[in-house]
């Protein structure tokens, strides 16, 4: 271990097989609580209006920390640092140009992070934005995702997709 790296292929007990017991005083880190949810049906949004995204289908929710039916928000049950992420797929229902889009992450009702794009040329009718951050959260904080889409004409839509419109978070083990 001259370079400070321990490389191990197999660990066995003193008899050469069996389970290894972790002794007292050892801290095991976990990335829970955690959740991920997605939008199961397209959500129509008013053109140019900041709208809460209603991620209504949970993929997993280890500690009942995500409300997928009323407030569409994440409220941690354990204080700590959390990795929080979201992706939104914006689209126009016609061949109308998307002018700009914004994805906002809110903490306790106020904007915490924002990602946006402005389209100046071309005929873009779909666009994906994502946001990731590490947040210090207590048990009464809550996090929500908002989207805003400006289009030339037609209907502004956040497209439903487990693979491209989702929201999740997990507690960092440290």
Question: Predicted segments — roles?
Answer:
Residues 2-6, 14-17, 28-174:
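Extracellular jelly-roll beta-sandwich "head" domains, especially the C-terminal globular C1q domain
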Residues 11:
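FIC/Doc superfamily catalytic core
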